[in-house]
Structure formats: structure tokens, C-alpha cells
Amino acid sequence: MTTDIRALYTRLPAIDRLLRDPAFSPLLAQHGHSQVVAQLRQMLDEAREQISQRQTLPDWSHDWLHACEQRLTAGQRSALRPVFNLTGTVLHTNLGRAIQAESAVEAVASAMRAPVTLEYDLDDAGRGHRDRAIADLLCQITGAEDACIVNNNAAAVLLMLAATASGREVVVSRGELVEIGGAFRIPDVMRQAGCQLHEVGTTNRTHAKDYRQAVNDNTALLMKVHTSNYSIEGFTKAVDEAELAAIGRELDIPVVADLGSGSLVDLSQYGLPKEPMPQEMIAAGVSLVSFSGDKLLGGPQAGIIVGKRALIARLQSHPLKRALRADKMTLAALEATLRLYQHPEVLTERLPTLRLLTRPAEEIRRLAERLLPDLAAHYADFAVSVAACQSQIGSGSLPVDRLPSAALTFTPHDGRGSRLEALAARWRALPCPVIGRIDDGRLWLDLRCLEDETRFMEMLLR
């Protein structure tokens, strides 16, 4: 070992000496002795490694207190951090999908602060059912006889199939054997539920006769799956829910539908593309309909099944129901969200998902133009401008439809793509990260989902 390297090692402080320093007292009080010691040991190990490999001390070694404090603070930061979603995808799966309404947030907070009547009947002091209040709301909204709540729509489909068709055949069109994110495939779910998949028709064309010809003594269900994350166009043919329900009634076979996203209002009234609604399926005679709570509905992650009372009872009594049931926070948020649908005249004001989806492009453009001057002055190495863009709904909802929007774009004057990557990384490291997208040599911030512009500017002008 050379004298110089030995000298570097001697400059490393002893942990005991650091802890005796009065300047460390606030850090010890805030984070505790064991966490501070563990962090200092890790820092010492890193410093020794750098001396060994590079014959230098770390940049932070001149101020152990500050470096230790920074690391401990970063380690205490929640893994679920609020961000600015300026990607252009409103229901972004990786960013938590639907933002909750204020009434839903308050309901969750209330449910967490005290015991609640989750499974307790106040009228007779007996055991109640956790789905009951929400089931009543869903029946009012959809016209169904009963409802069942689980923790997501994949679970809803699994439970629906396991409780009504295990060991038997389920007839589905080949054009509806969907796969969604995370490799969730309808055939795989059927296999897990113990069902036998019976494909009918072709990828682009399925007729009523295909379903009729497929039915046999082992047929348990006829199933419709809404292809919410892709579209087949051109020479196509599909059997709609009403026609399939009529076949089911004729042959005395239940018809079930997986809507995926599921919207409880006609989106076309807001100028958005129409999406199939559970109440339409129920009116058409479908026996069970499943859909998500955290997509177009705008609530928490949940799987919702509405339909015939006798079939819902089979779902409620199935062993999987307990494994898949929703907790009190989910139920509180979902109930509060569903109550908003009882007042459709103010839905676009109170439900964040619908508010963001219906936001006029001209309003978004005015916002971009208002923010442009300060940002252009601050980011002198970039050409900052306002550009028209297209938002998407996201989470597999209406995959081919786009919403006119406006974005702030950042183009490096020197044309180097590495500058865009560095800028995006810098924004992701902010206390409230700003998440955009890089495309066509520019960093885009689609402002459709930006509502707190004051906080946003505080972040970008740091």
C-alpha cells in the first residue's frame, strides 16, 4: 500500500467520533441511532471501495453529516410518489390510472381512522355483507339484480368463470381472445379457472351459427370479451350482446361479458368515443358483466360484476371470493365514486377522470401559452414551444381514439438527443417528478392532465 493511499484511509472518520459530534444530534433524533449507524457504515464501505479502486475519496466525504442526512431522507421517501403525468396518457397504468375524486379520498381517510361497518349490520347487530351497500348502488345505476366486488377485473373474470363453468366448456369467438398488459390472456384465465376454452369463428368474422353449432351438453357459458385495447377493421362480423343473449335464453345457457374498462355513462354526450356500458349489457339480457373500477369509471382499482341474482350468489359463495375480496379502503372509495354518478349534471366537475378527458383543447393550449415565456427563458439551451398533440385515454380503453391537446416541447439547440435524456432524468429526480415523453427529437409535456400549474412551475424553475 502506498503512502498516499494509506493517507486517504486515515482521513476516514470513526463512526463513534461522528456520533459524538453535536451536529449529528438532530439526525439521530429524527432517524434513530440504528439507521444513522447503518447509513454511516455503508458510506464508509463505499469510501474504502473508492480508495481501493480509484485512489480518491468520494465527493461527499468533506461533509459526512450532509451526505448522511441526504441519504436517510431519500431512503424515507415513499415509493409511491405523486408525479405530474404529462405523458399524454390520461389513465396511465404505470402511474396508477384514475385520480380519485375528493369525496373518494375523504371516504378512504375516514375508513382508515376508525372502525367501520364493513361487515356489521346496525339494524340487527348481526354480521352484514361487505359488498351490500355498493351492490345496491350498482343495481340502481346498471339495472342489474345484484353485484359482486373483487380487487380487479382480472380477478372478476377468474371468479366469474371458476364459479359458473369449472370443468366445463366456455364458448368464445376467436376474435375476442384478448391479451392485456402483464400477459393476462383470456385462455390462460380459463385454464386457471378450470374451464375448457371452445373457440368459434375466425379472427375477423364470427356468426351466430358458430355459437349455436358449438353448444353441447358440456357447455357452461357463452362469453363476450370486449376488445378494448385493439380494433379489428375491414371485412369483419361479430355477434352483438343482444343476439348472443337471445341465443343463450333459447338454449338455456348463461351469457357473460368481460367489458374490461367499462363506462357507466355514455361518453359520446361529452364528445368522446362511445364505449360499451354495463347497463346496456344488462338490458340486452347478458347474465353477468364484469368491468374495472379504476379505468373509465374513475374510481379505485376494483373488479365489478353485475348481473343475475342467482349467479351472483354462486360467486359470493365460491372460495375464491374471499381470496379476491376488496378491502375497506377500496370499498369506501368505490362507494363515494359511484355516488357521484347519481348526479350526472356535475360529473365532469367532480370526477377527475371525466374532467381530464373532456378538457377542451383550446383551454389546454391557452395554459401552454401562459407558461411558455418563463420556461423558455429558464431553459436557454432548448427551443421551447407550444405544439398541438394527441392525448390517449390509456389502460386499454378506446385504443385507436385520440383527444386533441397541446404540449410544451423542448428541443436542444445543439440537436443532441443525450440532452433530452438528461433533461428527462433531471425532471424525474425532482421532489415532485415531471414525467413527459421523448418523440421526434423533442421532449413533450402534454398539459391535458396538468391542473396544479403553480406547483408545476415551482418544479421546473428550480
Swiss-Prot record:
The modification N6-(pyridoxal phosphate)lysine is found at K295. Pathway: Aminoacyl-tRNA biosynthesis; selenocysteinyl-tRNA(Sec) biosynthesis; selenocysteinyl-tRNA(Sec) from L-seryl-tRNA(Sec) (bacterial route): step 1/1. Its EC number is 2.9.1.1. It catalyses: L-seryl-tRNA(Sec) + selenophosphate + H(+) = L-selenocysteinyl-tRNA(Sec) + phosphate. Disulfide bonds: none annotated. It is found in: Cytoplasm. The keyword Cytoplasm applies. Gene3D superfamilies: 3.90.1150.180, Type I PLP-dependent aspartate aminotransferase-like (Major domain). GO terms for biological process: conversion of seryl-tRNAsec to selenocys-tRNAsec; selenocysteine incorporation. One of its GO terms (molecular function) is L-seryl-tRNA(Sec) selenium transferase activity. Keywords: Cytoplasm, Protein biosynthesis, Pyridoxal phosphate, Selenium, Transferase. Its cofactor is pyridoxal 5'-phosphate. It comes from the Bacteria. Pfam families: Se-cys_synth_N, SelA. GO terms for cellular component: cytoplasm. It is an enzyme of class 2 (transferase). Homodecamer; pentamer of dimers. Binds only one seryl-tRNA(Sec) per dimer. Converts seryl-tRNA(Sec) to selenocysteinyl-tRNA(Sec) required for selenoprotein biosynthesis. Belongs to the SelA family. This is L-seryl-tRNA(Sec) selenium transferase. It comes from Klebsiella pneumoniae (strain 342). The gene is selA.
